[in-house]
Curated annotation (Swiss-Prot):
The gene is yidC. It is a multi-pass membrane protein. This is Membrane protein insertase YidC. It comes from Synechocystis sp. (strain ATCC 27184 / PCC 6803 / Kazusa). Pfam families: 60KD_IMP. Coiled coil: none annotated. Its main location: membrane. Specifically interacts with transmembrane segments of nascent integral membrane proteins during membrane integration. Interacts with the precursor of PSII reaction center D1. Coimmunoprecipitates with CyanoP (tlr2075), FtsH2, FtsH3, Phb1 (slr1106), Ycf39 and Ycf48.
């Protein structure tokens, strides 16, 4: 049994999504509600990560100074050097400790991402690989039923089934032989039997040959005819019932890419990508990722990286496009993260950290700026 991302998606994400859809009767609002519930549930973990990051940013200069001092003092005694380094880590904390909350969140966030990339927000594809053999070879092979991995398919609002594609005679066909692709639930019901009549046209499967077009032919009803020996691949596509549903300024939740088939710009998707990049930049500014400690060349370099990062992450969606519904989730999650960061960065620091921060700021104010430093780098961090 699958207890990974698929299990979380099927047994946690989809029931929550169905619950909210039953209340608001809008897949767009259901996505927002699902995102907020998951982010609120993960709040303690992400809050711990932000607090640890804030602490390490303040203590890093002193920690680095101690480590360099230990390396010089015990350069001829590796065992003693390691012992003293361990004491420093115990005093200041391990910088990698902030990664643990992130790692604990990843399976849930990936499951949420996978849920929104599936039905009903996107078309679902099944791949069937076939091997066409000469008739005399097929006669010596015992047929074995083939089935694809089941996927959750929404056949109506808040109604879904695990659906798979079957080949009763197996994947090996003889030249001139015909077979029928059968779409069924895991309980053995034909796909057209579980679809409400009102959605029969919307959910009509389509069949296409993605490899070996000269070796097989596929009819609109899923009948395959083997033509010549070789390998071939058939793709079965079941439409998502909400893929073409709009929400607020979004034309279709399943729409993919900044440009459409005719080259027109999808301004709704482009707007979300730009806002996503802006939210990353704002989050970095709020978390003080470009500040802390005494300004130096390394801090200046970090400022440049923080300006480039939003552009890189936003540009990624131009080359790896996602459905509009998934982009909306990512934007909402980033907005939540930004608000969370704003709240946590205003928390009063512990007395020892506040004292250390005050000393760093006094040292920064007490020296002249170097030519490559900007005046903005001397701004104080707000602690309340």
């Amino acid at each position: 049994m699958d207890f990974g991302i698929g299990f979380i998606s099927t047994n946690i994400m989809l029931p929550i999504l169905d619950f909210f859809f039953g209340i608001v009767h809008s897949y767009g609002f259901a996505i927002i509600a699902l995102t907020l519930v998951i982010r609120l549930g993960l709040y303690p973990l992400s809050a711990g990560q932000i607090r640890n990051m804030r602490k390490m940013r303040i203590t890093q200069p002193l920690m680095k100074e101690r480590q360099e001092e230990i390396q010089k003092r015990y350069k001829d005694d590796p065992a003693k050097q390691q012992e003293e380094m361990a004491k420093v880590m115990k005093e200041f904390g391990n910088p990698l400790a902030g990664c643990l909350p992130l790692l604990l969140q990843m399976p849930i966030l990936f499951a949420l991402f996978a849920t929104l990339r599936g039905s009903p927000f996107s078309d679902i594809n099944y791949t069937v690989d076939l091997q066409i053999l000469p008739q005399e070879q097929v006669e010596r092979i015992v047929p074995q039923t083939f089935s694809t991995k089941p996927q959750n398919i929404y056949v109506d609002e808040a109604l879904h089934y695990p659906i798979a594609v079957f080949l009763p005679g197996g994947k090996m066909l003889g030249v001139g032989e015909k077979t029928q692709l059968e779409i069924q639930s895991t309980e053995g019901k034909a796909f057209n039997q579980v679809i409400p009549e009102k959605n029969s046209q919307i959910l009509t499967p389509t069949y296409s040959v993605t490899k070996g077009e000269d070796r097989i032919s596929v009819n609109p009803d899923g009948t395959i005819e083997a033509l010549v020996p070789g390998d071939a691949t058939v793709q079965v596509t079941i439409p998502g019932i909400a893929a073409r549903t709009g929400f607020l300024f979004i034309k279709a939740l399943g729409q993919v890419g900044v440009t459409g088939e005719n080259g027109e710009i999808n301004w709704d998707i482009l707007g979300m990508i730009v806002f996503f990049g802006f939210s990353i930049y704002l989050n970095q500014e709020l978390s003080g990722a470009s500040g802390g400690g005494a300004p130096n060349a390394q801090a200046q370099q970090q400022q440049t990286i923080n300006k480039i990062t939003p552009i890189l992450f936003s540009g990624m969606f131009l080359f790896f496009p996602l459905p509009a519904g998934v982009l909306m989730y990512i934007v909402m999650a980033n907005v939540f993260q930004t608000i969370q960061t704003l709240i946590l960065m205003r928390e009063p620091l512990p007395e020892n950290l506040q004292k250390l921060l005050d000393e760093q700021q006094k040292a920064t104010q007490g020296r002249e700026s170097l030519p490559f430093e900007k005046k903005s780098s001397k701004k104080k961090e707000k602690t309340s």
